[in-house]
C-alpha cells in the first residue's frame, strides 16, 4: 500500500513539474525593420543595431547636467544609441539612405544586411544609396572584406563631403591620429569610385524617388538631409542633425564632439527643428530610438518628440 501510494505521488509530482515547467527564454528580437507608407511611397526603417555612447563626455555641456537630464528620462551614460538607415521604394527605384557601420563597431552593429533581407529585399535590389555624410557608422556597410556589398547600386553624396573625406591632400593636413575617418571613407567609397558607381551632387539637387538633397553642413563639411515628398506628405531624413533626444530636444543649442563646425551644426539643428515643428512633416533621425521616425511639436523654447504611431500593414 505504501509502495503503491509512493509511486502514485511520485508520478503526480513528475507530471505536475512537467506541466508547470517554464518555457525557455528565446532571447531574440523581432527583425529590425519598420514599414510605413508616405502617400504612395513605401518607407522602411532599418536597424543596424545599437551602440553605447559616453554622451556625458561627448555633448558640449557640463557632464553632471547631461547625467541629470538623462535621469529625467530614466537613462544614463553610456547611452544605448540606435543606428538607423532607411529604404525608400517608389515602385520604380529602391533607394537606401545610409548603410550603417558594417563590421567597424563590433557585434552590436552591422545588422543592416540581415534586416534588409528580413524586410523582403536583397542588397542586389538597391538602385541608389544616398549618404548623409561620410562618418563610419553611415558608410561602413558599403563594403565587406574590401568588396562592394551593393553591386548594382550607385552611391551618391554631397560634393563637399566627397571633396573633403576622399582627399589625400585633406587627410595629410590633419594630425596622424585624426586620419582614421579619412582612411575609413576612402576604404568604403573607393571600390564604388573604381567601379564607376559613385556620383556627387550639389545641395538642392533632386534625386531619384522624389527625394531632394537639403544642405545641412556643419556636422561634416557636406552633411546632407534628404526630403521625400509624396503628395501632401513629406519626410525629412535628418542624418546626424542630432544625436541625443533626451538632451537636444530640450536644448537645441547643445552640440556634440563629432560636429566638425560646432556653430554651423547648432544653427542647422535650430533651424531644422523650427521648420519641422511649424510644418508638421515627418522626420527620421539616424540616432533617434528605432525606428527613429516621428514629428516635432514646439513647447516654448523646447520641442516634444512624437514618435510615429504604429500602423500594421496587413
Question: Language-model features: where?
Answer:
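Gram-negative bacterial Sec-dependent N-terminal signal peptides
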Residues: 1-21
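Metallo-beta-lactamase
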Residues: 22-23, 110, 117-121, 125, ...
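Conserved beta-strand hairpin/beta-sheet module of binuclear metal-dependent hydrolase folds
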Residues: 29-119, 225-242
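Active-site environment of divalent metal-dependent phosphoester hydrolases
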Residues: 31, 54, 134-141, 164, ...
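Divalent metal-coordination and catalytic microenvironments
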Residues: 40, 88, 98, 126, ...
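Active-site metal-binding loops of divalent metal-dependent hydrolases
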Residues: 48-49, 99-102, 134, 160-161, ...
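Active-site metal-binding motif and surrounding structural segment of the metallo-beta-lactamase
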Residues: 85, 91, 107-156
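Cap/insert and terminal regions of metallo-dependent hydrolase folds
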Residues: 227, 231-314
Amino acid at each position: 500500500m505504501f509502495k503503491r501510494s509512493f509511486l502514485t505521488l511520485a508520478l503526480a509530482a513528475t507530471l505536475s513539474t512537467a506541466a508547470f515547467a517554464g518555457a525557455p527564454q528565446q532571447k531574440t528580437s523581432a527583425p529590425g525593420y519598420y514599414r510605413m507608407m508616405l502617400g504612395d511611397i513605401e518607407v522602411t526603417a532599418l536597424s543596424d543595431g545599437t551602440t553605447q555612447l559616453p554622451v556625458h563626455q561627448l555633448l558640449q555641456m557640463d557632464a553632471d547636467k547631461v547625467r541629470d537630464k538623462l535621469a529625467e528620462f530614466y537613462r544614463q551614460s553610456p547611452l544605448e544609441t540606435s543606428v538607423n538607415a532607411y529604404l525608400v521604394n517608389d515602385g520604380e527605384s529602391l533607394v537606401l539612405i545610409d548603410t550603417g557601420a558594417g563590421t567597424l563597431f563590433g557585434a552590436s552593429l552591422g545588422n543592416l544586411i540581415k534586416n534588409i533581407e528580413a524586410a523582403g529585399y536583397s542588397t542586389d535590389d538597391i538602385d541608389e544609396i544616398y549618404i548623409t555624410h561620410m562618418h563610419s557608422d553611415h558608410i561602413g556597410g558599403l563594403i565587406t572584406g574590401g568588396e562592394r556589398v551593393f553591386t548594382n547600386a550607385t552611391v551618391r553624396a554631397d560634393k563637399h563631403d566627397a571633396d573633403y573625406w576622399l582627399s589625400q591632400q585633406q587627410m595629410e593636413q590633419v594630425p596622424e591620429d585624426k586620419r582614421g575617418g579619412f582612411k575609413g571613407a576612402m576604404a568604403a567609397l573607393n571600390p564604388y569610385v573604381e567601379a564607376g558607381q559613385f556620383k556627387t551632387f550639389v545641395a538642392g539637387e533632386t534625386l531619384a524617388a522624389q527625394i531632394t538633397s537639403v544642405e545641412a553642413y556643419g556636422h561634416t563639411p557636406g552633411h546632407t538631409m534628404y526630403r521625400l515628398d509624396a503628395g501632401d506628405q513629406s519626410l525629412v531624413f535628418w542624418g546626424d542633425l542630432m544625436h541625443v533626444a533626451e538632451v537636444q530636444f530640450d536644448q537645441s543649442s547643445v552640440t556634440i564632439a563629432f560636429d566638425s563646425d560646432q556653430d554651423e551644426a547648432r544653427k542647422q539643428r535650430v533651424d531644422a527643428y523650427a521648420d519641422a515643428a511649424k510644418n508638421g512633416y515627418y522626420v527620421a533621425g539616424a540616432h533617434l530610438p528605432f525606428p527613429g521616425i516621428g514629428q516635432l511639436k514646439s513647447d516654448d523654447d523646447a520641442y516634444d518628440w512624437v514618435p510615429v504611431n504604429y500602423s500594421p500593414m496587413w
